[in-house]
From Swiss-Prot:
Keyword Transferase: yes
Matching InterPro entries: Adenyl_kin_sub, Adenylat/UMP-CMP_kin, Adenylat_kinase_CS, Adenylate_kinase_lid-dom, P-loop_NTPase
SUPFAM superfamilies: P-loop containing nucleoside triphosphate hydrolases
Organism whose genome encodes this protein: Yersinia pestis
Protein's UniProt name: Adenylate kinase
Length: 214
């Protein structure tokens, strides 16, 4: 069961990735984690990646694909894996295909931009404990105060509206073209494509995923 998750930041991919990992026992492969692990391990690919990153450059698609290939041969990926945040672009998707990395399911989480902005911008965090609230969907008992300690809640830099809108623009420019790419792949019988309504509650989306993945 090899799965790619598509969807804008804030579309609920992380929550559902957790559900899939627990239900089906497959690992989530994050390219960021993989790069850090390779650098730490000092592997040949890791040393190459470190050299590029130390120079302040972006790691090449070829190098990331090589890391993905290496990662999916590990024992925990025997029954499959979950890719979130990769591929981000059509050249990356093409490179994956050329490297012989097959994908069984592409799952797109569809949420309108304005709802994503509302979801993210409304988040409030208690920095010390990591407790997360939402002004509309999960408000604290006392406005802007943590329920347990009564301490001030803060807004993460990533959750500020200008940052969220910038990330959405980047997503639509870079990653949205993958939707039509994987539709074509599905039409050619190379994968199965499903679009999920991410505006529903978590349990409803999880239930639909369980039906799709069996």
């Amino acid at each position: 069961m090899r799965i790619i998750l598509l969807g804008a930041p804030g579309a609920g991919k992380g929550t559902q990735a957790q559900f899939i990992m627990e239900k089906y026992g497959i690992p989530q492969i994050s390219t960021g984690d993989m790069l850090r692990a390779a650098v730490k391990a000092g592997s040949e690919l890791g040393l190459k990646a470190k050299e590029i990153m130390d120079a302040g450059k972006l790691v090449t698609d070829e190098l990331v694909i090589a890391l993905v290939k290496e990662r999916i041969t590990q024992e925990d990926c025997r029954d499959g894996f979950l890719l979130d945040g990769f591929p981000r672009t059509i050249p990356q998707a093409d490179a994956m295909k050329e490297a012989g990395i097959k994908v069984d399911y592409v799952l797109e989480f569809d949420v309108p931009d304005e709802l994503i902005v509302e979801r993210i911008v409304g988040r409030r965090v208690h920095a010390a404990s990591g407790r997360v609230y939402h002004v509309k969907f999960n408000p604290p008992k006392v406005e802007d105060k943590d329920d347990v300690t009564g301490e001030e809640l803060t807004i993460r830099k990533d959750d500020q509206e200008a940052t969220v809108r910038k990330r959405l623009i980047e997503y639509h420019q870079q990653t949205a073209p993958l939707v039509s790419y994987y539709h074509k792949e599905a039409d050619a019988g190379n994968t199965q494509y499903f679009k999920l309504d991410g505006t529903r509650n978590v349990a409803e989306v999880s239930a639909e995923l369980a039906t799709i993945l069996g």
